[in-house]
Amino acid sequence: MLPNFAVLPPEVNSARVFAGAGSAPMLAAAAAWDDLASELHCAAMSFGSVTSGLVVGWWQGSASAAMVDAAASYIGWLSTSAAHAEGAAGLARAAVSVFEEALAATVHPAMVAANRAQVASLVASNLFGQNAPAIAALESLYECMWAQDAAAMAGYYVGASAVATQLASWLQRLQSIPGAASLDARLPSSAEAPMGVVRAVNSAIAANAAAAQTVGLVMGGSGTPIPSARYVELANALYMSGSVPGVIAQALFTPQGLYPVVVIKNLTFDSSVAQGAVILESAIRQQIAAGNNVTVFGYSQSATISSLVMANLAASADPPSPDELSFTLIGNPNNPNGGVATRFPGISFPSLGVTATGATPHNLYPTKIYTIEYDGVADFPRYPLNFVSTLNAIAGTYYVHSNYFILTPEQIDAAVPLTNTVGPTMTQYYIIRTENLPLLEPLRSVPIVGNPLANLVQPNLKVIVNLGYGDPAYGYSTSPPNVATPFGLFPEVSPVVIADALVAGTQQGIGDFAYDVSHLELPLPADGSTMPSTAPGSGTPVPPLSIDSLIDDLQVANRNLANTISKVAATSYATVLPTADIANAALTIVPSYNIHLFLEGIQQALKGDPMGLVNAVGYPLAADVALFTAAGGLQLLIIISAGRTIANDISAIVP
């Protein structure tokens, strides 16, 4: 198991790098190896000069020939040993180079300590929440320090391991002298290090690729920075092992912040994704440098991270091959045809720290993408002007998006493969059908009558919802899944098809309602025998009261009441900042986005397409329906979360 530096705070990683003697001892060792190499070269030249002088002089015959052969072997021994010493010096300098790079990339411990001291000071004086924005900013900076140190340590480990693989004991070097010529050609000189080391390591990995094991890097979703053992087990059993048998799955830390959804005072989505991408790319290269193949599992936010890392690796100077790297993604916001980030390309909300990145690349590395129908994050309607469909998708972010790990293997095996891809692709797309509309889940929670009423309206409501995806029969877009598809205005569906679907839905709804009503299970009346006894003398005797115990109880009650009031106040005013940020986005970014869409439509019309005028008006309206509905859902989620926290705080003091 390779070390996971990402689980260590910057206080630990920074202290490790900056403590100790630094690179001076390794530089001294490199100089010593250089001196030894120079002495061995001089000895070889001197011995060769002496023996050749004897041969060209008066010493002739068989004895002279035997001496020449023996001398040649010894000269070869000296020369090869000198080459070994030069190689050791080069490796020592390569280690120094790797260390210096890590040192430069690591946050200085004094900066980390100053950050923590500032946070402690602000928290101590944060009586009315006035310091909350400053605390959040410092915590965000601390998260950046964490990611920076983790990436630096991971890179240091990869580089140091590459150097260590080339080192061998002096005795082993001496024993290998008969084949010194080929060995000398493989050793990098001091001028070539550390790139010579990297090339040598990569050559060794390529030669042993057939024997490489596959390591699965499992990342959590938003709010799950460190996946639990159960999470890793389910990710492997349900999604990874089917396509990569024998994978060795292990958790990978990524920040997974999502202000203000996960925690109000939390890392923003953009910062979290950026840090996670650095960590994932470093972990992938670390495993590949160790001779392993890698398969990556990403869920929700970590699917976005995976999408970015795919593109970064493929565009790098030393990209992994498709045989070395693969991906499995679930609940992917960057789904080419359905991901919410792809439906609204390029939109950015600076106040919330959220930016829509591009679609997941489909032809870079072998990838499987699983999406649950009506998951509003990965399966957003193509035609958001359909308010019912958009509202259902927003409900799906709450009721469906978290269901990927409660599915059974049979449900996943029954997933619908989307095979109508365009052009060459390495990605396989799967849709897992959803029986019930998320929009009706609140109605289903009503006792007794909830399910019958939901089943009465669901067939027709599903037709309307599905029209938001383009086909009344499917709750997902049926156009090519590997083509990035932004939102549109109206689906091209015949009114006759819609009418037929509504007629069939009405019949099905009435039938389902009648069946449910005829099979209602009414709650039984309470059994009187279960009522508590009120007979005199029953129950536990009440201990006698004393003045001391009464005062102690009053002190405890006073302290608990004050703490609860403080917690309730903190939770209440903490919701003000995200509410203000949402309002900021709604009042600034959304109008700007509308103007952008309007101008695109006008440009389309000026180029001769009359639909541009329709789009100039319709696209802003469609975007507003989706964005304002999402903003309302987000605000409602924040209020519900705060309400639960307040209720729990109050219930703690109520007997």
From Swiss-Prot:
Pfam families linked to this entry: PE-PPE (PF08237), PPE (PF00823)
InterPro entries: AB_hydrolase_fold (IPR029058), PE-PPE_C (IPR013228), PPE_dom (IPR000030), PPE_sf (IPR038332)
SUPFAM superfamilies membership: alpha/beta-Hydrolases, PE/PPE dimer-like
GO annotation terms (biological process): response to host immune response
Domain (PE-PPE): residue spans on this chain: 245-469
Recorded family membership: Belongs to the mycobacterial PPE family.
Name of the protein in question: Uncharacterized PPE family protein PPE28
